[in-house]
Design a protein with these regions (language model features):
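FAD-binding core of flavoproteins
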Residues: 1-68, 72, 82
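Extended, low-aromatic, Leu/Ala- and acidic/polar-enriched alpha-helical coiled-coil segments
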Residues: 57, 88-98, 127-130, 135, ...
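C-terminal helix-coil-helix/basic helical segment that borders enzyme active sites and/or dimer interfaces
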Residues: 71-85, 98-132, 145-153
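Hydrophobic alpha-helical segments of membrane proteins
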Residues: 136-144
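Glycine-rich phosphate/cofactor-binding loops in nucleotide/flavin-utilizing enzymes
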Residues: 148-175
Length: 175
């Protein structure tokens, strides 16, 4: 349409498997019957609430992936003559990941249920689920990079991708 343009995929540090672009509106004429009014704004907010459930779900998946990657690394890497998995601080870090995963999952399920009941869901519960899940994902992605050591920042490492994607997830879709 006249006055609407779109960019090619943005060169982002994260979510590289899901290209994002921009829409630009310049001097676009909107017919009076097509303008976003109160009912349309409500629908738009329901869309944002759905995006928050989506972000919370991603956060849960990222935490679970961090747990999986760290368990494999801890069982296969040795330090001080023993597997990392025998070192109490590593056990504690992975245990905290598992605890936050369960909390994030249950909060996300409650938020999803509220959305499924209609009327756009409980916006406070949806925001809590998004905030907790994405913050926990970031926190545990940082821990995963630490557990991996130098390999954690190498491009071939899965945890470096979790780190990049978790940061973006905190920013997307607001709170």
């Amino acid at each position: 349409s006249d006055g609407i343009s779109r960019s090619g995929p943005l060169d982002l540090m994260s979510f590289r498997g899901m290209p994002l672009g921009e829409l630009t509106f310049k001097d676009v004429k909107v017919p009076a019957g097509s303008a976003l009014m109160v009912a349309g704004f409500k629908g738009m907010m329901e869309g944002i609430n759905l995006a928050r459930v989506d972000a919370a779900s991603y956060g849960c998946g990222f935490i679970r992936a961090a747990i999986r990657e760290c368990c494999v690394r801890a069982n296969n890497r040795t330090a001080f003559g023993q597997p990392l998995s025998n070192i109490q601080v590593i056990q504690t870090k992975i245990g905290l990941m598992a605890t936050d995963y369960e909390a994030a999952r249950l909060l996300t399920l409650a938020a999803s249920d509220s959305f499924a009941l209609g009327h756009g869901g409980d916006p406070i519960l949806l925001s809590k689920a998004k905030l907790f899940s994405t913050d926990a994902a970031m926190r545990h992605a940082v821990e995963a990079v630490q557990i991996f050591g130098a390999l954690g920042v190498h491009h071939s490492s899965r945890v470096q991708r979790l780190f990049r994607d978790s940061k973006a997830l905190q920013i997307f879709d607001g709170t």
